[in-house]
Amino acid sequence: MGKKKFERTKPHVNVGTVGHIDHGKTTLTAAITKQLAKRGRAEFVPFDQIDKAPEERERGITIATAHVEYETDKRHYAHVDCPGHADYIKNMITGAAQMDGAILVVAADDGPMPQTREHILLSRQVGVPYIVVFLNKVDMVDDPELIELVELELRELLSKYGFPGDDVPIIKGSALRALEADDPEHPDTKCIFELMEAIDAYVPDPVRDIDKPFLMPIEDVFSISGRGTVVTGRVERGVIRVSEDVEIVGFRPTFKTVCTGVEMFRKTLDQGQAGDNVGVLLRGTKRDEVERGQVVAKPGSITPHTKFKAEVYVLKKEEGGRHTPFFPGYRPQFYFRTTDVTGIMTLPEGVEMVMPGDNISTEVHLITPVALEKELRFAIREGGRTVGAGVITEIIE
């Protein structure tokens, strides 16, 4: 079978496998690629190739992640799988692999385990919107009642962490048997196709960045004589058109102005959209009224804040992080989008210190207001060196 070029006409969705160690995440990933490859929908990626995923650096943090892709009738999927538990935590906190839906793999003979809980909680915290469950290794359990119990326990656990436990699809099967089956019509492969159908049906098409309200972090400010002030940056989401109202948010009181021009590579455009590096000309704005670190946004779409809750991963010494723990009252810089702001970290009750390599839930109080929202990623830095990564889980004020 020759390589089929993936058609980009289908909606694109990002998914990933999560769950406890040895419950079968990587086996399932390999089985999906094998069975879909037989239908010309993927390239088979064997287990050991996924397991020996190369390390990537994301914001200075080393994460081992395997990427595979496949398609169904409805969609094109990019799927991530991480070899180690720590890689998952880093992945979810840095948003290196943003997931529109997660496939939670749970071994039926084990039931939910500590990492199962942690991955569900993290999915909720970092904003993974949908979970589909693959109940693996059902061939290892003789008693159907035990399988039902595990299923009940899982639904309760999902509900406890804010997912709709009663509605979450639970597909039962054996990833190993599906991986070993060479005939795509073999009954052992049925679970793979059921899983794909469940993801197709249950995880909605994500809202594309271009359809969200406009936001561009300011990287640079210029004044062009006779024309006014231009702010440049990469459009994070949405579309900006000439003569639309915008707000400048962060550091100082928010103010409104009008976009009087959009330029890209010195050419004038009618609009700039998500992913474009553009210059936006602002009406009647002085050069000293705007600065790097503020954002240009659709009015009312984002507000400045100083206090929030976050999930944070602290880099290990080997990752270039701190060599020593930090304590309550720690004051590093928090790097949001294009700038550093000093803030104070409050540690959770009963936590006296945080060691390199830990992940914690924390509260942060910034000394100046910044345009913030839930699920925004940030780096924690000391003197320009990244020592941690975080994601906002809740805005306080």
From Swiss-Prot:
Q: Out of the domains of life, which is the source?
A: Bacteria
The GO molecular function terms of this record are: GTP binding; GTPase activity; translation elongation factor activity
Residues that, per the record, bind Mg(2+): T26
Q: Which organism is it from?
A: Syntrophobacter fumaroxidans (strain DSM 10017 / MPOB)
Under what name is this protein listed? Elongation factor Tu
Q: Which InterPro entries match?
A: EF-Tu_GTP-bd, EF-Tu_GTPase, EFTu-like_2, EFTU_2, G_TR_CS, P-loop_NTPase, Small_GTP-bd, T_Tr_GTP-bd_dom
Query: Where is the protein situated, by its record's location annotation?
Result: Cytoplasm
List the residue ranges of the region (G1): 19-26
Statement: the UniProt record of this protein carries the keyword Repeat: no
